[in-house]
């Protein structure tokens, strides 16, 4: 496979290294977060974004905080560890991968509680690195599982950015597209611009073009027309949280695309790692939806586009009911309706399908 060389998040002795996604596509800038507080700010300010990437980054931020903690006893380290985890948990509420990563690091800390402090610190760093590698492997498995579902030829629409930039590498929805192209399929990607943060226009187009994949950017309100004209044969998106019944929380505008796809008889696929599946949340109505600063809507590239004092709504995500979802692609396999049964069955399978 030709793998993307984009390094979204990396561990270094100096801290957690992130590509600043707020600067793309015109500038490729890397920032080093030297403290766990700086990592938390980077997540909140969307220097790093995408549910899997947020989870990996949070794990590394926790490891960084533990490594550098000025604690002389286990009790002191545990107290600091709790504060670090709380700080990470307050960054972004919708992406369940964030809380999955925090819980995993918490379990690891408790497993190590009888070890010397130096060992605890080293092992916590190792656990974060393991999460990073596991995410890449999961994305590649997702790509294999989803590539067979893509058309042998034609247009594939994607919304937001669910690629290497949203993960530790390779991508979820874009991983499926990458794997399909690498298998010889002749795919043309249509990337919704994805207002208001423009992840499709800025990020998806940037990374697909780096890989030489045929890509066309369209504005969000063009999707229906493209479908009606027969230019779209499939839709594949990522997810920030998937409920037990298959309802999908993803970037705002995903619900609209799903309804349009259903109307035009076009399959709508969701690609996400198992850490995005939240079997403890029964349906989409229970998923918290992050509300972001209205300035993201009122301003584009620093220029105000709306009248002063107009009211603004800026939910970062919407929920697509499972009835619009053709299949959910994970590293463990592909789930189809009824999702409450198929997702439970996948929960019992191996972590990564062969």
UniProtKB/Swiss-Prot annotation:
Give the superkingdom in one word.
Bacteria
EC numbers on record: 5.3.1.23
Mind telling me which residues the site (Transition state stabilizer) is annotated on? 160
Task: Give the Gene Ontology MF terms in alphabetical order.
Answer: S-methyl-5-thioribose-1-phosphate isomerase activity
Residues of the active site are 240 (proton donor)
What positions does the entry give for substrate binding? 49-51, 92, 199, 250-251
Protein name (database record) = Methylthioribose-1-phosphate isomerase
The protein's role, per its UniProt record:
Catalyzes the interconversion of methylthioribose-1-phosphate (MTR-1-P) into methylthioribulose-1-phosphate (MTRu-1-P).
Q: Does the keyword Isomerase apply?
A: yes
> Which UniProt keywords are listed?
Amino-acid biosynthesis, Isomerase, Methionine biosynthesis
HAMAP family named in the record: Salvage_MtnA
């Amino acid at each position: 496979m030709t793998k993307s060389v984009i390094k979204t998040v990396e561990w270094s002795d100096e801290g957690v290294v992130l590509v600043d996604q707020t600067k793309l596509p015109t500038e490729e800038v890397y920032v080093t977060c030297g403290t766990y507080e700086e990592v938390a700010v980077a997540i909140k300010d969307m220097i790093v974004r995408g549910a899997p990437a947020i989870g990996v980054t949070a794990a590394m931020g926790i490891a960084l905080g533990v490594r550098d903690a000025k604690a002389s006893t286990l009790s002191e380290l545990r107290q600091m560890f709790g504060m670090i985890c709380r700080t990470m948990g307050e960054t972004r509420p919708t992406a369940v991968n964030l809380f999955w990563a925090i819980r995993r690091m918490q379990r690891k800390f408790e497993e190590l509680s009888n070890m010397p402090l130096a060992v605890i610190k080293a092992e916590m760093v190792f656990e974060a690195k393991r999460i990073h590698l596991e995410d890449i492997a999961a994305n590649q498995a997702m790509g294999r599982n989803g590539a067979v579902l893509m058309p042998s030829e034609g247009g594939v629409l994607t919304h937001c950015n669910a690629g290497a930039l949203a993960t530790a590498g390779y991508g979820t929805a874009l991983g499926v597209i990458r794997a399909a192209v690498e298998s010889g399929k002749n795919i043309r990607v249509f990337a919704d611009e994805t207002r208001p943060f423009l992840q499709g226009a800025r990020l998806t187009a940037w990374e697909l073009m780096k890989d030489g994949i045929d890509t066309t950017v369209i504005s969000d309100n063009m999707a229906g027309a493209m479908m009606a004209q027969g230019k779209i044969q499939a839709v594949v998106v990522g997810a920030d949280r998937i409920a037990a019944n298959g309802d999908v929380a993803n970037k705002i505008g995903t619900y609209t695309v799903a309804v349009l796809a259903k109307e035009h008889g076009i399959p709508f696929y969701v690609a996400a790692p198992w850490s995005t599946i939240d079997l403890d949340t029964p349906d989409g109505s229970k998923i918290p939806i992050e509300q972001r600063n209205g300035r993201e809507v009122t301003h584009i590239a620093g220029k105000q586009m709306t009248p002063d004092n107009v009211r603004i709504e800026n939910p970062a995500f919407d929920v697509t009911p499972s009835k619009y979802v053709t299949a959910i692609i994970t590293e463990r396999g592909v789930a189809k309706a009824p999702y409450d049964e198929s997702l439970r069955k996948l929960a019992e399978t191996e972590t990564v399908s062969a």
